[in-house]
Amino acid sequence: MRLGGPWAWLLGLPTAVVYGSLALFVSVLHNVFLLYYVDTFVSVYKIDKAAFWVGETVFLLWNSLNDPLFGWLSDRQFLSSQPRSGAGLSSRAVVLARVRALGWHGPLLALSFLAFWVPWAPAGLQFLLCLCLYDGFLTLVDLHHHALLADLALSAHDRTHLNFYCSLFSAAGSLSVFASYAFWNKEDFSSFRAFCLALATGSGLGFVGAARLLRRRVEAAGREPGCPAMAVNDGLCEEELLVGGEEAGSITLGQYLQQLARHRNFLWFVGMDLVQVFHCHFNSNFFPLFLEHLLSDHISLSTGSFLLGISYVAPHLNNLYFLPLCRRWGVYAVVRGLFLLKLGLSLLMLLAGPDHPGLLCLFIASNRVFTEGTCKLLTLVVTDLVDEDLVLNHRKQAASALLFGMVALVTKPGQTFAPLLGTWLLCFYTGHDLFQQHPPAPVGSAQPWPEPPAPPPAQAPPLRQGCFYLLVLVPIACALLQLFTWSQFTLHGRRLHMVKAQRQSLSRAQTLDVKMV
């Protein structure tokens, strides 16, 4: 009876809460990983410089390829539009398969996270293996989690409801960044290891528990009429035929890529999202540099650390306000408004100049918060593209994970372009090469190796001016490009309603076919 009470309470949680909690179990690990993995291998394990760059290069290639690879392996059976013979799968069975995958891959993600903080191999080899293992399991978790957003719900209202809880739990998970400051000590690493062990244990158990709850909810939805157990999708009540096997009706990777090349809205979206990913990582890479050269004389070190920490939490809290707006006005209108806001704030900052510390501080923080927040909203747009892809190509089932993987394949180069283009622009404008001096290190991180001393003070004014123009002109250029590409995107308004209606009618038609057979 003692166990029955809490378990009964957990079973009574809404599906959206259980789904959103998965974002918590990822966020508590990933934010700590981003903040400390370089410092750990450089300052604690003393990794060799050549081994560090070899590991980062291999990681860059693996990080770019694993999204479409795992998406293809997961969803290739869903691509055929031709009827085939074989064992049937229902829409509910697809969701159950994704939930089971999360139940396995989530704990493995937690184990791969733990592998960073205990030396168990030569530093270079451990660095390479840990990065590839961690990113592989993180990709699997992200793909199936995002795919569930498209599979559990069809209407925009229900999807924003699910995304609302993802933002709420992601904000809670970001608090692990603040807690980590109390345990981080390069001289005595044992307390930080214990902290990471506690995070990994909680995350792994959370994945197992959440996957079990979701599985019971989906299974109950198939047994009970009207789907009372599922709060967000009536479609899971239906037994939609999805046949397996590798018969002649299957689609090859080349044919799928041709279909994507004809998917006009997909092409415009990934063009816009490439710029968005670039801008997000540009802000992350140069946030400490802007604080150092534009605000170091006006704010304390603790204030700068607080701004850095709050920038991890604020985008998720910000989305709690924007998601209700998405329900009312649509994601397209809200994203367009955010692009206009980015352009307007950047133009105002350009006109004001670099001599207003308060305004600069507000702009640097808001620029990062709004940009990161926009990235979170774009997940909803990808789910709409999943619907349109299913309708345009008459698929038997939505290839959700595969489409998310293809979006990541096209947009991830923005992560690489951000630091390269930013440092090149700064060097071109000011003659200042960041690699020729010790750049300011973010809180909780460190640059791998000491560099020669900074240039003489006479170069400081041009560098400060260069940082300011980089800060305001990059958002202006990004906003203009995004407003143009977003204006070409037509999956909103009447067209979006038509796609939703056609997907619902396809689902009902498939259900009738199965019942007639």
UniProtKB/Swiss-Prot annotation:
SUPFAM superfamilies listed in its UniProt record: MFS general substrate transporter (SSF103473)
Location relative to the cell: Cell membrane
Key words of the record: Cell membrane, Membrane, Transmembrane, Transmembrane helix
Lipid bilayer topology: Multi-pass membrane protein
Principal location: membrane
Transmembrane segments: 12-43, 56-74, 101-118, 127-151, 156-179, 192-223, 265-292, 306-325, 331-350, 359-393, 403-429, 467-485
Cellular component per GO, a single term: plasma membrane
Segments in the Cytoplasmic topological domain: 44-55, 119-126, 180-191, 293-305, 351-358, 430-466
InterPro entries linked to this entry: MFS_trans_sf, TMEM180
Gene: MFSD13A
The protein's name in its UniProt record: Transmembrane protein 180
A Pfam short name: MFS_2
UniProt KW Ion transport keyword: no
Membrane-side (Extracellular) residue stretches: 1-11, 75-100, 152-155, 224-264, 326-330, 394-402, 486-517
Organism name: Bos taurus (Bovine)
Keyword Transmembrane helix among UniProt keywords: yes
